Swiss-Prot record:
Originating species: Oryza sativa subsp. japonica (Rice)
Location(s), subcellular: Membrane
Entry GO terms, CC: membrane
Keyword Transmembrane: yes
UniProt name for this protein: Hydrophobic protein LTI6B
Main location: membrane
Tissue: Expressed in shoot and root of cold stressed seedlings.
Keywords: Membrane, Transmembrane, Transmembrane helix
Entry-linked InterPro entries: PMP3
Induction and repression of expression: Early induction by low temperature and abscisic acid (ABA). Late induction by drought and salt stresses.
Membrane-crossing segments per the record: 8-28, 31-51
Family to which the UniProt record says this protein belongs: Belongs to the UPF0057 (PMP3) family.
Gene of this entry: LTI6B
Keyword Ribosomal protein: no
Length: 55
């Protein structure tokens, strides 16, 4: 269901941001953006993953 996230989703997004986004959206553009941001810096990847999962 879009717009909802439980504690496990958020925890996975903090530990490994691309995995959290992949589990929620699959291999779409959200995943690739998160992967790129995680490679550029771990914190931007976390911020984007939490944003994408909770929006």
């Amino acid at each position: 269901m879009a717009g909802t996230a439980n504690c496990i989703d958020i925890l996975i997004a903090i530990i490994l941001p691309p995995l959290g986004v992949f589990l929620k959206f699959g291999c779409g553009h959200e995943f690739w953006i998160c992967l790129l941001l995680t490679f550029l810096g771990y914190i931007p990847g976390i911020i984007y993953a939490i944003y994408a999962i909770t929006k």
